[in-house]
């Protein structure tokens, strides 16, 4: 029977699944959990238990769209691309207005207009290396009386309480309808680092008989691309993962389940609760190095090394190594330190197939 890996071994094997050039190596003093956080592109775990605000439906849809089990039914997923939004990216954040529930409406600057609001989006958790590819403002207005037919909404950059900034857009705003507007290139610059804060001034312009309304919801859907987490283009074979069978002790895929609860991350990781990382283990001696039907063909160099090792073992040369041949990605949905819902996509996290190299 194969030995059972301890918790530290689980973390170490998971780290070994990722290319060593993806991010800077962790200092030797780091523990397994801290090193894993760095590999996942997180400076630290959330310091406190989040409020567990409801996960927005759009984030669930994006997460399920990235689920490899569902993706194989249709067309293959493109690495570092958010298909549902049609943009490049590997990180999606749903950022609510940081003070909507407690911030009162401000008096209108012009007589005859409805009160105004200032919405603030905290983007301080975005890394400097990330580049925005979509910044979608989402607003919902509700009527305060039944005779409201709708309004015209003006969105401007906030300058100060006395002088509004430049107007970004002006759109019809029917009550109860979710309004969406792209702010990339206006409030959020394209191909540049994301600002720490986006502050917007909202103004309602009622019709001839319309009453004023209230701001019920305000959020920002931010998609960014972190090139450090994007692999080089390569040919992928989209086949079902399997735990290979073969003679005991030969090179094949072994099951390894990584549980976020065991690492202590279940309070802020929304989904998945864990995943099968798997790992490679076994010997690469002849004739096992020459894989049979259904397995990946060994390199000629690996076959030659196995043959030479069997005929005349050379000290220090050794036999071929059992390594991952095919890997697949996972996506993780979690709360960050600002209670934002974040979806991150990670390539090469699951070992699907092993071979001798």
UniProtKB/Swiss-Prot annotation:
Protein location: Secreted
InterPro entries found in the cross-reference section: Cystine-knot_cytokine, TGF-b_C, TGF-beta-rel, TGFb_CS
Glycosylation sites: 191
Tissues expressing the protein: Expressed almost exclusively in the nervous system.
Propeptide residue span(s): 24-237
Domain of life: Eukaryota
Pfam families (UniProt xref): TGF_beta
Disulphide bonds in the chain: 251-322, 280-354, 284-356
Protein role: May mediate cell differentiation events during embryonic development.
Further remarks about this protein from its record: This protein is produced by a bicistronic gene which also produces the CERS1 protein from a non-overlapping reading frame.
Name the UniProt record assigns to this protein: Embryonic growth/differentiation factor 1
